[in-house]
Amino acid sequence: MKLLNIALDGPAAAGKSTIAKLLAAKLSMIYVDTGAMYRAITYKYLQQNKPEDFDQLIETTELSLTYDKDKGQRVILDNQDVTDYLRENDVTNHVSYVASKEAVRTFSVNKQQELAAKKGIVMDGRDIGTVVLPDADLKVYMIASVEERAVRRQKDNEERGIVSNVEQLKQEIADRDQYDMNRDISPLKKADDAITVDTTGKSIEIVTQEILALVHKIS
């Protein structure tokens, strides 16, 4: 199979990361979790007591992704592995705000494009098909109902030992959608040439097979 770049976009908790990891494994490609980059910068932002100067924050930031056979992708921020801190509630609640800043976005997109330059990448996020990889070989826009996404997020939280309420999560997800779709820089939107895949009520295996079928059509 020829080397491809695959872009998966969509709102929070639509299943992008889970599916992207599986696709990459099945296709012997590299998975790049772009959300982890923004979460890492958000983690630093919180550790530094929410500075307002994002240009300075980025100037002092070193960020890289490494790949461990057993642990998968690891995020190295300023020479420290911060992967295990990136799903904390405080990071989740601030990541949209931090990711909307131009300095943060420019820094992260440049990193992502460098990673994709050699192809063979499955990348998920909110602006991959529109901004990061506009020439991706396959663009998929994943959606799911707010209700289902809230249940998924609660399940993820439970697995991490975090107590959460579905109704509250529904509101947070709906608010996040509005923020992401209406921000000035790299808003969440479907690329004109992206294929929509609705994951509502579907198992991980079924969604993965649907997207694999799309890959095989172009490879």
Curated annotation (Swiss-Prot):
Chief location category: cytoplasm
Positions that bind ATP: G10, P11, A12, A13, A14, G15, K16, S17, T18
Intracellular or extracellular location(s): Cytoplasm
Name of this protein: Cytidylate kinase
Family matches, as InterPro entries: Cytidylate_kin, Cytidylate_kinase_dom, P-loop_NTPase
Taxonomic classification: Bacteria, Bacillati, Bacillota, Bacilli, Bacillales
Pfam family, one: Cytidylate_kin
Keywords from the named record: ATP-binding, Cytoplasm, Kinase, Nucleotide-binding, Transferase
GO cellular component terms listed in the entry, alphabetical order: cytosol
Any one Gene Ontology BP term: pyrimidine nucleotide metabolic process
Gene Ontology molecular function terms on file: ATP binding; CMP kinase activity; dCMP kinase activity
EC number of this enzyme: 2.7.4.25
Reaction(s) this enzyme catalyzes, per UniProt: CMP + ATP = CDP + ADP; dCMP + ATP = dCDP + ADP
Family membership: Belongs to the cytidylate kinase family. Type 1 subfamily.
HAMAP family attached to this UniProt entry: Cytidyl_kinase_type1 (MF_00238)
